[in-house]
Regions:
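A short, highly charged nucleic-acid-interacting micro-segment common to nuclease
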Residues: 78-100, 120-122
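Conserved catalytic cores of phosphodiester-cleaving nucleases, focusing on short active-site segments
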Residues: 103, 131-133, 149-155
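A short acidic/basic microdomain associated with nuclease active sites
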Residues: 106-124
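Acidic, metal/cofactor-coordinating or nucleic-acid-engaging core segments within structured domains
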Residues: 159-229
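Charged, structured surface patches that assemble and position nucleic-acid processing machinery
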Residues: 201-273
Length: 273
């Protein structure tokens, strides 16, 4: 479960600023200060590509099509750059993966990356909870302080009218109470199929909260291109109807020209395979 921290993680910057909602909830503000750094982007594109298809699997999967590696990824695995709903699926997948990186490499959770490789239709979003992350106090012994974090991510990287994406993430997070059991099973099955048996068994810890209690943290994240980041709009977010209201974390991540970054990362992920 120990992974090297990818270089692009250094582009996460805690602004030290926050916004307080009318309910008194704190919204933390982070910035993603990406740069045109060839080596960092190259490493990031490989990290990103592995979510959809491991490099050692591509040749086997593309063989019957007669596609190059890039063609297989672009035509079969990745959301389409132009054909709807491909662009919105791209921004959604990208955002979920970026939030996964935040949880794993900044907050030190274990985040299984099983959500995208099993997609049947590249242009469609995967059903279930967006990001599930796990923290064990002691892997040898269960404690009530073991934590399951379930985060929902919503993005707006284009357009001119600011949308209430943080509220959308909160509203979607409400549904996670219903989706949790099935999403845990989906992760466990994919780990099992990948022969990661010990990792799959770790999911057992969180499948029976009545008999084996643990902490559950909810999270709602809005990701914006910086020109669409509006503090007044996000301050309108409310969580009073959320079943985990006392344990929900609110976060905004914004960065410059994010949609072009999304497309560039997908291009690199295909071309550099």
């Amino acid at each position: 479960m120990i992974h090297m921290t990818p270089e692009h993680v250094r582009w996460f910057a805690d602004t030290g600023k926050s916004v307080t909602t009318s309910e008194g909830k704190e919204i933390k503000i982070w910035e993603f200060k990406h740069e045109n750094d060839e080596e960092v982007l190259k490493g990031w594109s490989k990290h990103f590509r592995q979510h959809y298809c491991l490099d050692e699997e591509i040749d086997e999967f593309r063989e019957g099509y007669g596609f190059s590696r890039a063609e297989f990824l672009e035509k079969i695995k990745f959301p389409d750059r132009y054909k709807a709903p491909g662009p919105s699926t791209r921004s959604g997948d990208f955002s979920e993966i970026l939030v996964s990186d935040y949880l794993e490499f900044i907050l030190s959770y274990w985040v299984p990356r099983t959500r995208y490789g099993s997609k049947t239709i590249g242009n469609e979003s995967t059903k279930g909870c967006d990001v599930m992350a796990f923290k064990f106090i002691n892997e040898e012994k269960e404690t009530p302080e073991d934590t399951l974090a379930i985060f929902e991510a919503k993005a707006q990287f284009s357009g001119t009218t600011v949308k209430p994406r943080l509220q959308d993430a909160v509203n979607d997070s409400v549904k996670d109470q219903i989706r949790k059991a099935e999403s845990l099973n989906a992760i466990k099955q994919q780990l099992y199929y990948k022969q990661k048996i010990q990792d799959a068994k770790l999911i057992n810890r969180f499948q029976n909260p009545v008999d084996r209690p643990y902490k559950e943290v909810s999270g709602a994240v809005a990701l914006f291109s910086s020109n669409l980041f509006n503090t007044e709009k996000i301050a309108e977010t409310y969580v009073s109807e959320h079943p985990n209201e006392q344990n929900i974390q609110l976060l905004v991540i914004h960065g410059e020209d994010m949609m072009n970054l999304v497309h560039e990362l997908y291009r690199r992920a295909a071309d550099e395979a």
